[in-house]
Amino acid sequence: MAIDLSSANTFDERHLGPTDADVDAMLDALGAESLDALVDAAIPDSIRTDVPLDLPSALTEQQVLDAAQDAGAKNDTWRSFIGMGYRHTHTPPVIQRNILENPAWYTQYTPYQAEIAQGRLEALLNFQDMTIDLTGLEIANASLLDEATAAAEAMMMLNRVDRRSDAATFYVSEDCHPQTIEVVKGRAEPIGIDVIVESPENFVFGEDTFGCLLQYPTTDGAVHDYRDVADRAHEADAYVAVAADLLSLTLLEAPGEWGADAVVGSTQRFGVPMGYGGPHAAYFATRERFQRQVPGRMIGVTKDADGEMALRMALQTREQHIRRGRATSNICTSQVLLAVMASMYAVYHGPEGLREIATRVHDLTKTLAEGLDRTGHTVRHDAYFDTLRVDLTDATQAQVRERAEAHEINLRYYDDGSVGVALDQTVDAEDLDALFTVFGATNGQKLYAEDLAADLDSGYDGPMPRQTSYLEHPVFNSYHSEGELTRYMKSLADKDLSLVHSMIPLGSCTMKLNPTAALQPISNPQFAGLHPFAPQEQAAGYEQVIDELSGYLTEITGFDDISFQPNSGASGEYTGLLIIQAYHEARGEEQRDVCLVPESAHGTNPASANMAGMEVITIDCDENGDVDLDDLREQAEANSERLAAAMITYPSTHGVFEEHVEEICDVIHEHGGQVYLDGANVNAQVGLCRPREYGVDVCHLNLHKTFSIPHGGGGPGVGPVCTAEHLSPFLPGHPVVETGGDQHIPAIAAAPHGSALILLISWAYIKLLGPEGLTKSSKTALLNANYLADQLSNHYDIVFRGPNDRVAHEFILDLRPFRSELDINEQDVAKRLMDYGFHAPTMSWPVVGTLMVEPTESESKAELDRLVDAFAAIRSEIEAVETGTLEAEASTLKQAPHTAEMVTADEWDRAYSRETAAYPVEAVRERKFWPTVRRVNDAYGDRNLYCACPPTDAYEADEEEELTSALKTA
């Protein structure tokens, strides 16, 4: 045989869990002749694609890293003083290495299972406390997608809390960032809110006005005293929202103190790279009386079964997974990993450190202003924090721009000929000297920053100075050395179960392992350091990645075009529905406003449709879990003139490939509607079927599911929208960077390409696997799910099966009989799984009283068997209750989870042994994960809502009364 010089180190062998021998054993257990035979049995022939993926061949890990390095070298990372909500920042290496690059943090899931997420919950509580302190308000959430969408959420919240049915006008200051203005206007239009962009002094708070939005400081840097605006708004029963620079609030009066009812903004400059637009965590704070209207996740303090303090996600009944179309927002994924980074930045620097950073940035700005004044230019605003708008004298904007480009400096250029300069913590005296040269001296003198600074007083002395303290909690005043912070972060990580411990079999979440080689490029400063509004010629590397990834994903899905602007799957849904609306309007069919949504759909679907101004009609499912075709036809016929869209998920959320999906699409098209596919389950389709081929018009993809961007404990995510050719003209645009179709809908996110930095991960993932590896991944995902379903069916019923008695990439375990007969429910099983070292599958969705299991392709047979053993042992524990050996309340299931403190206590009065509690099967001994709190009390936490860092005496409380008292007096 001839020598083969090609590399044998293909990545699919690293990514796929089962070995060839494992595959054979699993197929044998399933009675399947081959992997292809299993796939053929699971997927209807009618939707299988006949065309293999036309993608580049797989590369090795080193080849992908080299390709990423080459692409990064094409970016020009100039010094960007553009501002507009994005700044250079120093990411402390201790945070970069121990949070951003640490799989114990980035592979976690959203902390629904609080007992095994106390570390992440504490980090997010720190984030909320930081937000509350700096904004001067009472409550905050645990992050939103970006500043612009947070401002839109604030508008919607204030509209909800306003009791006047005819109040539908919202003022937006013309001094807000342009991307914020556009996103707010775009969000308002579908739901009938009239946005008026105006100067704040001209706001007219009539009876039809429910609120306004201000920027603090303004987009061009001015610090205004807005107390009069707030007073006028409140006198008219209107509300005030403020988009504030978080670092500036260490020096400026907190908006909550001068009348703001909601404050939003970005935490990007708290140690998170710009990344050509994201991802970054937005913050959201408001008044306590609006607590049940807050969008997104909130972390709150509660107690556990022993009365000890614990943390959990609070007020979940606000959210889309419970309230569906009546939710406060469609938000699901947020920006948890970035919120953790920002909170650790505040913990690391503390209040004094943050004030020092802000003061230094302001001093640099003051020095720049002095120099510009001496050169004859005029700084437009007397009061500023770190941004100047310069009216030029004896120089044109073109001349300044030419000199700036010669020095590789980006500035902001206004239409009126003025120039903007926004400084940040990375600026030094040499940067100021370069800026003096760029602006030029009218009298020929050369200026030096150090000389100017010697004659100036340090500190902020403008209007609205901050008088109140902030970040006084011990957590912000204890970990300022690298050693202390490292240990603190490690102590939190140790409390959280992630993929470094075991598989996370969450249905519809696709918790696959994330290739390290795919994540490595995001730390490259040539990608991380780029401003999203830098000239496009400076972003050639990004343009290459975006263009190539666009081609890969359209090839995989069969669509024609794509936009990466949506920062989450829910945002992608909303975008797709707006595109459908724009399409109907362009055809003169504005009356089409009905959206058909199956009852099995993700909660984000009806929530997104409502946000898009559509009327949601729910379609029944039949006894097999499929969309009820008769009901679909009936509703489509009854609403034929108004039908805008139907939203489907494929494979269905019931874990099967419905055989009549093409017929569903045909019915909708016959009545003039468009078909939207929720791409949450595309991991079962890549290389096997293409959504466009079976009739879908538009879909979103979850790059944080199928294409291996890690979940980060609840974000970041990317939800790009893929469109058929007839919908492509309506892809979202952007007010600053040209993008989208020629009839584009407004921007739906702050940055033109959304969270561009992490697109690198999916780009690298596809390159690593190539067409054969991607297809094999889908097949292996089906194999793993069918093997698990087969093994678990010996102990539990599987609710739905598809063609030939097979499931798709996920399936539903039925626990309902145990609830009705034994008072043992899905939550009891979920908590007991923690003692076995596993995160629970998805609970009570899409069928109440069940668990939905998705193993993904990256789990080995050994890991699948560990999960089977755990479920089998739990079934035996249930049987002990069935036979009367134990009462349900005395069983391991009702008492779970068991902490180390509990099982090592001097007294043990349980009806089972300590060993049964802690080490129920032998495999647990090899890698025991200990929950750090007992079962949390959700009801107590919601009754006694507390969303900030608790006082020190709360940690010492032994009884419920002591904890309640400590929280109420804080």
Residue spans of the language-model regions?
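Non-catalytic terminal extensions of PLP-dependent enzymes
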Residues: 1-29, 41-81, 90-106, 112-115, ...
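N-terminal export/assembly segments and adjacent metallocofactor-ligating motifs
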Residues: 110-120, 126-128, 141, 145
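Conserved PLP-enzyme active-site core in the AAT-like
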Residues: 119, 149-310, 372-376, 389-390, ...
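A conserved hydrophobic secondary-structure block that centers on an alpha-helix together
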Residues: 130-151, 165-166, 170
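General small-molecule cofactor/ligand-binding pocket signal
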Residues: 140, 194-198, 380, 412, ...
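Conserved phosphate/anionic-ligand binding catalytic regions in large, soluble enzymes, centered on
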Residues: 272-285, 289-290, 334-338, 422, ...
